Amino acid sequence: MKKVILSALFLAALPSVVQAQEEENTPENSFTLSAQLRPRFEYRNGAYVPLQEGEKPAILVNNRTRLNLDYHHGDQLQLFVSLQNVNIWGQAPQVQLNDRTGGLSVFEAYAALPIYEDLNIKIGRQMIILDEDRIFGSLDWHPAGRAHDAININWKNDKLTLRSFFAFNQNYFDGNASSVNGNVNNPKGQYFYIAPGTQPYQHLEAVHAHYDFAPTQGLSFLVANLGQRNSSNNDIDYNMQTIGLHYRGKSDALRYGAEAYLQTGKNVAGKDKEAFLLAALVDYQFTPAFSATLGLDYLSGNDTNDPTATKDKAFNPFSGTNHKFYGFMDHFYVSYSPSVGLLNPYLNLTLKTSDKGNLSATGHYFRSAGKIVGDKDNKTRHLGVEGDLVYTHKIQQYVSLQAGYSLFVPSSAYNKLRDLHNVRKQQDWLWCSLNINPKLFSAKF
């Protein structure tokens, strides 16, 4: 009888023992290795800067190579590192004794860990992407992308997400030398220098809140402070504040949105800042295969040749993915930031050509926000028109193809602003890109 009772107790306890063993053997760690190879052919016949008569177009293939290492220890720690090489085909010789491409760089390298319940922190080099890239974006179109050295503290519940960002940048300028000294052991003061290719700010403080007050309705609020210094007054901090709202909504086949941002404080030269950005769009899905978007962007600007102006009214989308908004040929807020601002009405038509492909066409009309004095054809605010055509096709799970053609017709006022002469009437750009993103290895242990 005792044996029967013991056997029954053992069988009853067995599932609990097995479950406990399974819980003990549940992997706490995971590791994923992924990669990206993205070559892009470009025929630049006026991209970035309009070509003048007699100038030849640029023909090249640029390439991005990334290797991503993503480690998780349960929900207690994430460590992410993205190594990157950016080059032009032919930049490195066939027999490569020295790496002329600049070698490997670290695109992202951060650790993320919980602080308390719904509060977590991410520290290190990381992308900052907010509200469809208008003010903070990844700049993914550029072969190198954009990342910040920063601390990111997040809190989230069902409907509300709070994100904060803090950064302090430092580089050392060698007195009369023309380059930044990368020596981390430099004992001299703190001389921060802003120059092309270096950091656009010394310190950054930003808070972003997003609230979903309905499943298809969301509102965001951003306040950001940019601490700037220039080489002439390096002991003085010029702080510029950006404050704004971003709204997106959807109802059946209709999608709509609006955003507004105000900039105040000082610009990098120490001049008072008083600028704003307004944007709105409406998108309608006519059929499962066809949609249209009508939108308008307005970035305030200054009048030209106004000696009485005491304030800088030019809005600065300092870390936005501006390629996405103001024309794919990058004539506005990429290669050139117009002090006169920009009015940009646009129309986008998107056609789904197959289960794996779609075709998109966008037309832009560019006009200055501020007055342009001395334009010979008296169209004192007309800056030009642009058309962008893009075809996307997913070849397989990890491979996609993109190709595009853009045409830009600058006005005489635009050429005058950029001090360009004898400019061709039409500028165009042709490109084709292959994006390969395989997951190479994944394991739990």
Predicted feature locations:
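Cleavable N-terminal export/targeting peptides
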Residues: 1-26, 439-445
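Transmembrane beta-strand segments of Gram-negative outer membrane beta-barrel proteins
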Residues: 23-48, 75-81, 217
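Sequence/structural signature of outer-membrane beta-barrel proteins
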Residues: 40-48, 88-94, 126-139, 167-173, ...
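Surface-exposed loop and membrane-interface regions of Gram-negative outer-membrane beta-barrel proteins
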Residues: 49-63, 73-116, 130-139, 266-273, ...
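Extracellular/periplasm-exposed beta-strand and loop segments of Gram-negative cell-envelope proteins
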Residues: 56-58, 196-198, 249, 271, ...
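C-terminal structural cap/anchor segments
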Residues: 298-387
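Outer-membrane beta-barrel "beta-signal"
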Residues: 424-445
